């Protein structure tokens, strides 16, 4: 049977999602868990696929992986989570066709970026975001990774303010390395008046205009979900979702305490 899982993880705990030698990654922990439970023998023999690689520091709520297994009764979130560290958790699973590929079968991906509000002109950022919609060559918004084509299609970009936080949602068919984070940088530069829409249009014409821009920090980015455009019957695991919520509430409290400590340190007279 072929099984797909929805995974969430806290990216700042790992050196990216893709397995690498000598460093902690999401896949390293996932493969270890699946082998320990005898769900798979190896990623290759199980025809393992992943919806998309995330860089070090980037989080996920709806990462999708798929693999073949002879023990589908064990390939469920609450069992797999028993072998995973708290910073990674599976929360839904589904039986999928034998040909399902978590990456190639994807129709679109949704990324969400969170950053401090500052004094951005949100109306300018929203107007600029409209220029990015549709199909463009995003070479100036990527880090070279041997891609055959740098043409991508963006379906939706939404910029909104939530208190002191600015949030940007980006939905597209697929994304280049660092593409979302560089889009965030570009919109931020327009929002604070450093650049304008004419510059953004130039950036979308890499055959004539080339400029490298720094990607926004990875810790603000989350892969929210992957759309497959077909009727996958996901079964959510309420226990796993509830347990992850409890564990991460403790993490939130620790961060709040640490923020208060830092405030006191820098304001001490």
Curated annotation (Swiss-Prot):
GO terms for molecular function: pseudouridine synthase activity; RNA binding; tRNA pseudouridine(38-40) synthase activity. It is an enzyme of class 5 (isomerase). InterPro entries: PsdUridine_synth_cat_dom_sf (IPR020103), PsdUridine_synth_TruA (IPR001406), PsdUridine_synth_TruA_a/b_dom (IPR020097), PsdUridine_synth_TruA_C (IPR020095), TruA/RsuA/RluB/E/F_N (IPR020094). It comes from the Archaea. GO terms for biological process: tRNA pseudouridine synthesis. Formation of pseudouridine at positions 38, 39 and 40 in the anticodon stem and loop of transfer RNAs. This is tRNA pseudouridine synthase A. The lineage of its organism: Archaea, Methanobacteriati, Methanobacteriota, Stenosarchaea group, Methanomicrobia. The gene is truA.
């Amino acid at each position: 049977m072929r099984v797909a899982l929805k995974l969430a993880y806290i990216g700042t705990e790992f050196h990216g999602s893709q397995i690498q030698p000598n460093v902690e990654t999401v896949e390293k922990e996932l493969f270890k868990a699946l082998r320990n439970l005898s769900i798979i023998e190896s990623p290759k023999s199980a025809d393992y696929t992943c919806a998309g690689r995330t860089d070090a520091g980037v989080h996920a709520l709806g990462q999708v992986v798929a693999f073949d297994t002879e023990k589908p009764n064990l390939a469920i979130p609450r069992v797999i989570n028993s072998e995973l560290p708290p910073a990674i958790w599976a929360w839904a699973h589904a039986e999928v066709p034998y040909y399902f590929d978590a990456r190639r079968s994807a129709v679109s991906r949704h990324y969400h970026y969170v950053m401090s509000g500052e004094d951005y002109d949100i109306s300018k950022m929203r107007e600029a975001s409209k220029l990015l919609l549709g199909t463009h060559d995003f070479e100036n918004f990527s880090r070279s990774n041997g891609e055959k084509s740098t043409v991508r299609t963006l379906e939706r970009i939404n910029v909104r303010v939530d208190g002191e936080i600015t949030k940007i949602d980006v939905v597209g068919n697929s994304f280049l390395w660092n593409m979302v984070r560089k889009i965030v940088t570009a919109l931020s530069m327009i929002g604070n008046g450093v650049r304008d829409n004419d510059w953004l249009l130039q950036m979308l014409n890499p055959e004539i205009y080339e400029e490298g821009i720094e990607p926004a920090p990875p810790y603000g980015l989350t892969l929210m979900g992957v759309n497959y455009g077909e009727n996958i019957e996901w079964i959510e695991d309420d226990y796993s979702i509830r347990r992850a919520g409890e564990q991460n509430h403790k993490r939130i409290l620790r961060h709040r305490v640490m923020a208060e400590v830092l405030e006191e340190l820098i304001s001490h007279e």
